[in-house]
């Protein structure tokens, strides 16, 4: 084997070892992102909704900056209610760890009946938010705003 091939192989192995220690995002975040992509294909990366306005992403306060942000406020409230369901084994702030199943067919989202009550509630929260996002324009000016100034 050529020395150059050995160096490439060594580099790949080191990269894989490093990647193994990187924490994975929760599955629910990925499911929610896929739902958004189902309702808004090719328009806006779902990652743009992770830090938008006062309510999309971590932290929630103040008055929503626009209709997209209102979708996120409603989504936060929906997650809180889902976390209160008897038999739902998550705390409201851990609801992102709930796995659920759904189908996307030509922009239409359906939460599968195989979901338990908690999974169905979280799935429907994500479904409603994805549909809500599709109804309103995404304003790049509200991405990654200073929430301490704009969200009082």
From Swiss-Prot:
GO biological process, one term: phospholipid metabolic process
Gene Ontology molecular function: calcium ion binding; calcium-dependent phospholipase A2 activity; phospholipid binding; toxin activity
Glycosylated residues in this chain: 112
Tissue distribution of the protein: Expressed by the venom gland.
SMART domains in UniProt: PA2c
Pfam families: Phospholip_A2_1
Compartmental location: Secreted
Gene Ontology, cellular component aspect: extracellular region
Key word Signal present: yes
Family as reported in the entry's similarity comment: Belongs to the phospholipase A2 family. Group I subfamily. D49 sub-subfamily.
Primary role: Snake venom oligomeric phospholipase A2 that has potent presynaptic neurotoxicity. Chain D is not itself neurotoxic, but it is essential for the neurotoxicity of textilotoxin. Chain D possesses a very low phospholipase activity.
Listed name of the protein: Acidic phospholipase A2 homolog textilotoxin D chain
Naturally occurring in which organism (per UniProt): Pseudonaja textilis
Lineage: Eukaryota, Metazoa, Chordata, Craniata, Vertebrata
């Amino acid at each position: 084997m050529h020395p150059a091939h050995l160096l490439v192989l060594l580099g790949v192995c080191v990269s894989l070892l490093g990647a193994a220690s990187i924490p994975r995002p929760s599955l629910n975040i990925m499911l929610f992102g896929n739902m958004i992509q189902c309702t808004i294909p090719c328009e806006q990366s779902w990652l743009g909704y992770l830090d938008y306005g006062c309510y999309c992403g971590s932290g929630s306060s103040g008055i929503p900056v626009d209709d997209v942000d209102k979708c996120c406020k409603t989504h936060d409230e929906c997650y809180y209610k889902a976390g209160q369901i008897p038999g739902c084994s998550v705390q409201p702030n851990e609801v992102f760890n709930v796995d659920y199943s759904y189908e996307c067919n030509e922009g239409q989202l359906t939460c599968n009946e195989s979901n338990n009550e908690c999974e169905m509630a979280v799935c429907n929260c994500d479904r409603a938010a994805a549909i809500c996002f599709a109804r309103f324009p995404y304003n790049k000016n509200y991405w990654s705003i200073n929430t301490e100034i704009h969200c009082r």
